[in-house]
């Protein structure tokens, strides 16, 4: 039952993050949909982790080079997702208020993704591998 509560909490926080992103795009004052491109970063963020889990040997207690490379790529993706709306605001493609809403949405979404892997990445009976 604890896994279901965690899943509901994660889906709620994901909905809040996407609401911030949509508000940054769809409010009449902002009205520009360029920040929606951060959705690409949301989708590619867990891919290095998935590849590292499949390739690396879990018998090592220490961190492997493959896992460290996956952390590096994931960090680059997350930093790019935070930098993209700032660059759009600097070149005046979007307003700074929209940038703030998108950055708030980024923080909530990436914390949700991190929470997902912390809750369901343990490898117990109720894990993310079932989904």
Curated annotation (Swiss-Prot):
The keyword Membrane belongs to this UniProt entry's keyword annotation: yes
Annotated transmembrane regions: 7-27, 32-52, 69-89, 100-120
Record-level GO cellular component terms: endosome membrane; Golgi membrane
Keyword Ribonucleoprotein assigned: no
Tissue: Widely expressed, including in liver, duodenum, kidney, pancreas, lung, spleen and brain.
A biological process from GO: late endosome to vacuole transport via multivesicular body sorting pathway
Superkingdom in the source lineage: Eukaryota
Localization per Swiss-Prot or TrEMBL: Golgi apparatus membrane; Endosome membrane
Primary location group: Golgi
Alphabetic keyword roster: Endosome, Golgi apparatus, Membrane, Transmembrane, Transmembrane helix
Membrane topology term: Multi-pass membrane protein
PANTHER family according to UniProt: LEPTIN RECEPTOR GENE-RELATED PROTEIN (PTHR12050:SF3), LEPTIN RECEPTOR-RELATED (PTHR12050)
Family statement: Belongs to the OB-RGRP/VPS55 family.
Function: Involved in protein trafficking. May be involved in the down-regulation of membrane protein levels.
Name the UniProt record assigns to this protein: Leptin receptor gene-related protein
Lineage of origin: Eukaryota, Metazoa, Chordata, Craniata, Vertebrata
Gene for this chain: LEPROT
